[in-house]
């Protein structure tokens, strides 16, 4: 794993950037300041989408290989999105309480374009991207669902099932998934096929 990193402190907007090389060595690159209060920062290619869930304000920017952050655009979306999941240049927005979803695309110029709106089941605690596919998980029931988001922002449900309850982290690694429980340290692995 190698690439640039952005560290953000929401209380005062301080940022620091760094780089991890192919050997895992970290190098500090730059320091700066952004607006405070961002609740979500989502990477989309080299661009970043900043989101405030209390008022829906967004900003987009680009992190250069030199660690310098450049602001690209500002805008506004609906407030209250609990999860924002990137899939290529597209984004899936999800509200846990209503199941409302919206999809959009972030251009390389930082412009956000809404693509589609819809509704899914409520209560998903984790939404994990794997290529164009998504794994939805409810930690209280173990319920899962999988689906696909196309480049036009259209979501298609693929399958439903169940896993164990209580997984607190689900990490994608290619087509494989690592499941982790913070209370017990238990792990499990799985694979999502393309069907």
Regions found by a protein language model. Name each.
Residues 1-195:
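Trp/Gly-enriched beta-strand/coil motifs that build multi-repeat beta-propeller-like domains
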């Amino acid at each position: 794993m190698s690439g640039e990193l952005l560290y953000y402190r929401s209380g005062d907007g301080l940022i620091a950037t760094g780089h991890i090389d192919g050997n895992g060595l970290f190098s500090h690159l730059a320091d700066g300041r952004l607006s405070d209060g961002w609740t979500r920062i989502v990477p989309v290619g080299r661009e970043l989408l900043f989101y405030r869930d209390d008022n829906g304000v967004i900003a987009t920017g680009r992190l250069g290989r030199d660690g310098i952050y450049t602001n690209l655009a500002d805008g506004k979306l609906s407030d209250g999105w609990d999860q924002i999941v990137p899939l290529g240049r597209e984004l899936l927005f999800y509200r846990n309480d209503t199941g409302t979803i919206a999809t959009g695309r972030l251009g390389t110029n930082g412009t956000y374009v809404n693509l589609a709106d819809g509704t899914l089941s409520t209560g998903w605690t984790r939404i994990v991207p794997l290529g164009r596919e998504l794994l939805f998980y409810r930690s209280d029931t173990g319920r899962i669902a999988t689906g696909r988001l196309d480049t036009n922002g259209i979501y298609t449900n693929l399958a439903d099932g169940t896993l164990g309850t209580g997984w607190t982290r689900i990490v994608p690694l290619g087509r494989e998934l690592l499941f982790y429980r913070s209370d017990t340290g238990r792990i499990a692995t799985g694979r999502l096929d393309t069907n």
